Amino acid sequence: MSKNPDKTTPATANAVTEQNIAADVDEVMRKYDRETNTRIWSGWRAIVIKVFMACFAVYCICMTLFSTAMPEIRLPLFMGFIILAGFLNFPASKHHVKPNYLPWYDIFLMVIGAACFFYFALNAMTMIRLATRIQPIHVAIGCIGILILVELCRRCVGLPILVVAGLLIVYAFYNQLSYGASFYKALQNIIYKLFYTTSGVIGTPVSVCYTYIVLFIIFGAFLERTGIANFFISFANRLAGWSSGGPAKVAVISSALCGMVSGSSVGNTVTTGSFTIPMMKKTGYKPEFAGAVEAAASTGGQIMPPIMGAAAFLMAEYIGIPYAQVAVKAILPAILYFTGIFISVHLEAKKLGLNGIPRDQLPKWRLLVRDCYLILPLVLLVWLVSSGAKTMSHSAAYSILAAIAVGLINFFTLRLRDTQTHTLRTVGKAAFSAAGDSAKSVFDSLEAGAKGAITVAVACAMAGIIAGCITVTGLASILINAVVQLAGSATFIGLILTMVCCIILGMGVPTTANYCIMASTCAPILIKMGYPLVAAHFFVFYFGIVADITPPVALAAYAGSAIAKSNPMKTGINATKLAIAAFIVPFIFAYNPQMLFENVTSVFQIIQIVITALLGIFAVAAGLEGYILRPMHWPLRVLAVIGGLTLLIPGTVSDLIGLVIVAGIIALQVMQNKKAAREAV
C-alpha cells in the first residue's frame, strides 16, 4: 500500500505555519507602514542599489563625525542624496510595482530633484549673500526642489503631513499678498525662506536628523541583526511568561525593549506582534485585546529610555538640554505608562481566569545568561551617553562598532554549536563562515539603516517647511493668543485643547514631524500659560505619540488588528483603554514637574508623586477593566475611575480622598470574596 501523499509531518506543518505568518507580516507592513512599500530589485540591479545605499550610510556616518562644512552645504548635500535614494526605493504607487523597473519619470524626478539641492550646496555662499534678492532662476530651482520633495513625501510618508504643509504654504502666500507684496515678490520671499535658509527644509529637524537620528537608525539596524530582538522576547518570556496571562505580559515587556530600538510603533507592532499576538490568542485573550496590547506596548517603545525614538533627539535640540537629560527625565513617565498596561493585562487575565505558560516550556536562565553579551552595544551606548565621555554622534559610532563585534561573535558561536567536534579545523571553518556572515550582516545593516533614514529625513524636511511657514506668518503668536483667551484662567482647559490639537495633527503623521509641529505651535501655548518648558515639550511629545493608537487613524492599532484578525476599531478602542496612562501621565507632570526631575526639593516628594500616580493609574485601569479581585458592577467601576483620577490631582486633600475611595472599593471586594467563599462551602 502506498503512503498517503497528503500526510504532513509536524516539521512540515510548522514550516507552513511560519511561512503563513511571514506572509501576513509582509502584507500588514505593506498596508500600514509606508517604509516597506519599496521597489523590488533582483540580480545585478539589486547589488548596485544595495551598494549605493550602503555607501550612503557610510557617507552619513563619516560626514556626521568628521565634516566641518557649514549647514548650508552639509544639509542640502544630505537632502540631495535622500532624494536619489528615495526615488530609487519608493515607487509612485504600491499597487503598480514592477520588478527591476524604474520609470522614466522617476529617473527625471530623481535627477532634477537631487540637482536642485546639489546646486544649493555648491552655491551656498552666493545664496547667503543674495538673501531675499535671489534671481528668478533661483526661485525656479527652489520651487522645483520643494515640489519634488513633496512628491517623495507622498510616497514614503503619507498625505496627512502634506495636507498640513500645503495649507500652511497657501496661508503663507496669502499672508504675503495681504501685506501688499506682488505675486512674484511673495513667491520669492517664501521660496527663499523655505528652501535657501535654515528656517525651512534644512531647518532644525533636518539638522538633528543628519547629526543624530540617522546614526541611531543605523545603530538600530545593526542591533536588530545581532539577534537582540529574540533575546528580549526570550528574556520577557522567562520573566513573566509563567504568570497569569503571561503571553500578554511578555508582549508588554518585549515590545517596550524592542520598541526603544526600532523607533517605529507600526514596525514594532508587526514584528514582535507576529510572535506575541498568536500566543495571547492561544492563551485565551480575545483577538481585539491581543492586538491592542501589542499596539499599546509597541507605541510606548518610543518613550522608553535610553534610545526612545527619533523625536527625543529633536526635543533635546528644541529645549536646549543634552539628550542624556531628556532620557533621564523620561524614566518615571515611561515606568508609569508600562505599569498601567501591565496592570490592565493582569486584571484582564484574572477576570478571564487565564493561566501562564508552563515553566518547562520557558527559556532557561542559563541560556539567557549565555546570550546576554548581545546587549553589550546597548550598555555601551548608555554608558557613553550618561557619562558624557563622548558626544552623541561618537557614542553612536562606537556602539555601531560594538554591534559589529557582537554580531561576529554571535555568528561564530552559532556556527560552533552546529559542529559536533571542536578541532582546530572545525573552529577555523566556523570562524571563516562567521566572518562571511558578519560581512553580509554589516552590508545589510548599512542598507537597512539608509532606507530607514529616507522616511525620517523627508518627514523632518516637511516639518521644517511647516515650521518655516509658521515663523513667516506669525501663526504661532495667533494660536497662542487664541488659546490663552479661550482658556482664560482655566489652565486645565488649555491642556485639554492642546491635547486635542496634538492628537488630531498627529493622526497619520510620523512622530518626528508631529513633534516638530507641536513644538512650534502648541508647546509655546503651554509655556505662555505658565507651564515649565520641559513639561510643555514632554506633554506635546506624549500626545503626538499616542495618536498612533487613538481612533479613527490609529495605525499601530490597525496593524495589530491585522495580525490578530480582529475588528480594527475595537482594537483601537482597546488600545486606547490599555494606554490610559499615556493620557493621564502628561497631566501629572504638567502640574508636578518633579516627575521629570524638575524643581525637586526632596526625594520624598518624588516618591509621594509616584506612589499616588501608581495607585491612581491602578484604580482607573481597574475601573475600565471592571475587575480588581472580582468583577465590578458599573457604579463601582465609575467610583474606581473617580477615585483614581482624584489621586492624580495634586494636593494632599485630593490624595487622601482618592485613597479612601480606592481602599473602600478594595475592602468591599475582599468582603464580597469572603462572602462568596462562605456561600460556596
Question: Where in the sequence are the language-model features?
Answer:
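Membrane-interfacial loop-to-helix junctions in multi-pass transporters
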Residues: 136-140, 199-212, 238-252, 283-289, ...
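Transmembrane alpha-helix interface/packing and boundary motifs in multi-pass membrane proteins
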Residues: 220-224, 255-264, 296-302, 463-467, ...
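Membrane-water interface regions at transmembrane-helix termini and the short interhelical loops
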Residues: 38, 63-68, 89-100, 126-127, ...
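Long, contiguous bundles of hydrophobic transmembrane helices that form the permeation core
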Residues: 2, 6-47, 53, 328-452, ...
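Membrane-interface helix termini and inter-helical loops of multi-pass transporters
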Residues: 67-68, 124-132, 188, 192, ...
